[in-house]
Amino acid sequence: IRKGESYLDYEWKVVKATHYLEFGRSGDRAIMESPFGKNNSALGSLFMPEMAEGKGRFVDQIINGVFASCEMTSWALSAHLGLQKVGGCFPSYEEHVIDLGSGNLASQLSCIYYYLKPSFDKVNPLISKRLRHELQVRILDTYMNEDHFWWMAFNLKPGGLVNNWNPWCNFNVLQCFFLLENDRDKLAKAVYRTMTSVDHFINYTHGDGGCEEGPSYWGHAAGKMYDYLQMLSDGTGGKVSVFDQPIIKNMGEYIARSYVGNGWVVNFADASAKGGGDADLIFRYGKAVESPLMMNYAAYLKSLSDKDGIPSGDPFRLFQTLLSREELEGMSADYQAPGYSWYPETEFCYMTNKNGFFVATKGGYNNESHNHNDAGTFSLYLNTTPIFIDAGVGTYTRQTFSSERYSIWTMQSNYHNLPMVNGVPQQFGSEFRATDVHFDSRRMYFSANIATAYPAEANVKKWVRSY
């Protein structure tokens, strides 16, 4: 409530036309995302205290935020407007895009509509009527009538990519349908369509549960899949639940196994090097799949945090946290990191020893999600301090997810812990991969031939790396 009070005089930001155009001009996406994100955060920070207090003090400001959102041509981010059939980075009034930005806002607005419609109607019925219309045409109708969004994976081709966008967008859409659609037949069709789409994400992921995108993306990938599956289970009265499937548990435990210590995590691909994850989310996921490892890890993370901290996240995660926080706080923080973790299909391997060393290495291929050309690379930590590091990724720009990606130094093998072979670095493409990848848990020994990750001009037949 105190946090919400600080937004009672918030000045709603305008996302200008030039903010969208800047992505095309310079590749800068933050100039558009900053005011858009601030408005969305303000809306959430006003909604939750109104739910907690229920006195109507925050309603007028929420209406201002809703109105500002409805007046926007698009809720999609400038960097994602290439999903429009007309392409570009400027929003078209003739079509709608479901991306991470529009989905997140729509998910929040659907909660606001569901819970605050009576309050809005007391002020003026046109407010909720307008909001319901915008959610219908931008999200519900668009999702049911369009197949061309790559993240849906309905037109997935062999070798195609399915990443965190899939469960993330489908979760947002599912929440909108559950809260807004009153026709049971239409709702059933929509729910089934989301299930078909999310199946592609689960099927894309290896059975070992490794997250190609790294720990900092886990909350948006497997973590959002958990949110989706939990909402699906809740919405169907538990009749549709796959929490007993081994792959779902494996995908969850990845986050606990990738923790080095003192806030450091294994950061392959575009992942950040610090941040152990959302303790409340990890606890709920762990409880759903009956994983003591995840639950103990969550308790450990919680013991490190501010005990009086305000829960954060989208409305669904906030409500779920309020339901589970007391149980989490009652657990003892006795997390013990595994001695090793081996992902035979994803080809990630983590090993520790009694001298305080932690080594993380990978085989893999050079077309993974958020790919770096890094087959065979490694990171080394001593007493949780990074010694040999992965530099990670810089600030996202237009260049990051374009044909120019591998002109960025952080994406190149020669800026990872890998050799230049005859002056030649590794190359991008699914065919450039580590081969003969093996791990012996008895000897704590990992090896991989990385020669096959280099192009022909490297003139290398075999190069075995072992740890």
Where is each model-derived feature located?
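Extended, loop-rich substrate-binding clefts of extracytoplasmic carbohydrate-active enzymes
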Residues: 338-357, 423-467
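Structural helix-adjacent loops and short alpha-helical linkers that scaffold large soluble proteins
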Residues: 50-63, 112-136, 177-195, 232-248, ...
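Long, well-ordered core segments of solenoidal/helical folds
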Residues: 4-15, 62-80, 127-153, 189-209, ...
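Non-membrane alpha-helical segments in proteins
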Residues: 37-52, 64-68, 103-111
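Active-site lining segments of carbohydrate-active enzymes
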Residues: 88-214, 227, 323-334
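Catalytic core of carbohydrate-active enzymes
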Residues: 358-440
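Carbohydrate-active enzyme catalytic cores, enriched for enzymes
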Residues: 222-388, 439-441
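Solvent-exposed loop and edge beta-strand segments that line ligand/cofactor-binding
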Residues: 27-40, 51, 86-102, 148-167, ...
